């Protein structure tokens, strides 16, 4: 029974980590587009998110050879 609870706890923690990373990657893409094109996705090529302590680094790239980094901070509750 204790092993089941431990495995369940680990699974829940991993699920939370994955969902936070997915949300952060989505935020990364939205920030790239908002800051450079004011919401226009026409020239958007890719956004990559690398998590760090209390936030992460977002790499933005557009088809017109514009590339830049954004530092995202996430509030800790």
From Swiss-Prot:
Give the superkingdom in one word: Eukaryota
Task: Write the signal peptide boundaries.
Answer: 1-25
User: Keywords on this record?
Assistant: Disulfide bond, Neurotoxin, Secreted, Signal, Toxin
What S-S linkages are listed for this chain? none
Q: Name one GO cellular component term.
A: extracellular region
From the UniProt record, which GO molecular function terms apply? toxin activity
Give the primary localization class: secreted
Can you say where in the cell this protein is located?
Secreted
Q: Which residue numbers fall in the propeptide? A: 26-46
Q: In which tissues is it expressed?
A: Expressed by the venom gland.
How is the polypeptide modified once translated?
Contains 2 disulfide bonds.
Hey, which family's this protein in? Belongs to the scolopendra neurotoxin 3 family.
User: What protein name applies here?
Assistant: Putative neurotoxin 1
């Amino acid at each position: 029974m204790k092993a089941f609870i431990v495995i369940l706890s680990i699974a829940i923690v991993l699920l939370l980590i994955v969902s936070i990373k997915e949300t952060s990657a989505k935020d990364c893409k939205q920030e790239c587009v908002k800051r450079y094109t004011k919401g226009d996705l026409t020239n958007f090529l890719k956004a990559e998110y690398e998590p760090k302590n209390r936030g992460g680094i977002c790499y933005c790239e557009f088809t017109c050879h514009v590339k830049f980094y954004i530092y995202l901070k996430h509030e800790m509750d």
